[in-house]
Design a protein with these regions (language model features):
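Short, low-complexity disordered leader/linker segments with a strong preference
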Residues: 1-43
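N-terminal secretory/targeting leader peptides
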Residues: 25-131, 140, 147-262
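Short beta-strand-centered segments that line the small-molecule binding cleft or hinge
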Residues: 134
Length: 262
């Protein structure tokens, strides 16, 4: 199977692995043959920083399953969750270099690499997650975003989501003044940090793998994530309250290295 056919199969997979899912090292080839035919086989890694029991993992695994099915078993994608291949920044860098062809991750860390992805970082823009999905599913919007990723050295294959991000804390929040001084963990995203700073909180960028122990040791007072992430990582063991800020949708992108794609 040549590269053009491989790319075509990936594009077909994209149609099966979009937002509807949430509502419900380089190429390594080996050749094996018979007297009748010779089959080229391929294997590639897909990296993610998310835990295994999340929509992100389900999205990645579904993509891998469809690639294998549509290729008749000649293409295999191995999914590596939990930052096994690196954190968000490292995954983006490795993907751009072509070392890790596929990455599934939240869009927030991508602002440093592609500033126009900040369109997803405008707080309080949407009232419902259905609104978010309607906009992201819009073909014109998708075309614009695909160009953004292409210009950044990637190709965008699709989006999924984990709902809205909410805040957890050990301090009861009943009005805006209650945000003041709270050390809240954020991702390394200037727009996220500006939002919490304007509420009077003290935003503290931190790698997600350090959040639980940060809450345990008092390095941070609060954090913000979608419910699924909070539950799967047992952050409720260190936090007393959930504040349904619903300030941002948590979008997940499936991207591929442009170098690999070409």
């Amino acid at each position: 199977m040549n590269r053009k056919k491989i790319v075509s199969a990936m594009l077909i997979v994209t149609l099966t692995c979009g937002l509807g899912l949430t509502a419900c090292g380089g190429a390594q080839g080996s050749v094996s043959g018979t007297e009748e035919a010779e089959v080229q086989r391929y294997a590639w890694p897909l990296g993610s920083s998310s835990p295994e029991d999340t929509v992100t993992q389900i999205y990645a695994e579904k993509f891998a399953e469809e690639v294998e099915r549509l290729s008749g078993g000649s293409m295999k994608i191995s999914v590596y969750p939990n930052s096994v291949l690196g954190g968000d920044r490292e995954l983006l860098e490795s993907c751009k270099d072509g070392d890790i062809p596929f990455v599934v991750q939240n869009t927030a860390p991508q602002v440093t690499f592609m500033k126009d992805t900040a369109v997803f970082d405008m707080p309080a823009l949407f009232e419902t997650i259905d609104e978010v999905r309607e906009h992201v599913d819009n073909p014109e919007f998708m075309e614009l975003m695909q160009q953004v990723y292409h210009d950044g050295g990637y190709e965008l294959l699709g989006y999924a989501d984990q709902g809205f991000r909410v805040m957890t804390t050990n301090k009861k929040v009943e009005n805006l003044s209650d945000f003041k001084g709270q050390k809240i963990r954020t991702m390394e995203n200037s727009y996220h940090m500006a939002y919490w700073k304007n509420l009077g909180a003290s935003p503290t960028p931190m790698t997600f793998s350090e959040v639980y122990i940060g809450l345990q040791q008092g390095t941070i007072d609060a954090q913000e994530n979608p419910y699924e992430v909070i539950v799967s990582n047992k952050l409720y063991e260190q936090q007393d309250y959930v504040v349904e800020t619903n300030h941002l949708p948590h979008l997940i992108s499936l991207i591929v290295s442009e170098e690999f794609f070409d």
